[in-house]
Amino acid sequence: MTTRRGRRALLIAGGVGLLALAAALVLNALRSNLVFFFSPTQVHAHEAPSSGSFRVGGLVRAGSVERAADGLTLRFVVTDTVREVPVAYTGLLPALFREGKGVVVAGTMGADGVFRATEVLAKHNENYMPPQAADALRQAGALPSATLQTEAR
């Protein structure tokens, strides 16, 4: 009876240990895949991580888009109307990418102060902007239009 009870306790303890290990691995994987959002003002205030990926959102400043000769490399400026972040991106842009329109870029900040984007997301209709970008523009006191819509949170 004691050996049977001992084996059962050992089996339960092993199962709990394996569950704890699996949970720790899943949480670690999720934490390493998190990408936080920051406005250009927050980036300049050093609230964004100095290393690692994050997102910057705002408006593409009018007149800031410069294309390289290869047709894929692009430089532009993301602004929240208070501060600006220069961005470099190599790749195909979304069809809705335009100067003066909302954009969210994901990537890392270079030592030279240029944000190296690995992904560019443009707003998908005339009155839409990602909620984080809209909040950042509201805090800056400038919204692109009075009819701005955001996703339900």
UniProtKB/Swiss-Prot annotation:
GO CC term (a single one): plasma membrane
TM spans (from-to): 9-29
Membrane-topology annotation of the record: Single-pass type II membrane protein
Residues reported to bind heme: H124, Y128
Biological processes per GO annotation: cytochrome complex assembly
Residues exposed to the Cytoplasmic side: 1-8
Family: Belongs to the CcmE/CycJ family.
Biological function: Heme chaperone required for the biogenesis of c-type cytochromes. Transiently binds heme delivered by CcmC and transfers the heme to apo-cytochromes in a process facilitated by CcmF and CcmH.
Protein's name according to its UniProt entry: Cytochrome c-type biogenesis protein CcmE
Species: Bordetella parapertussis (strain 12822 / ATCC BAA-587 / NCTC 13253)
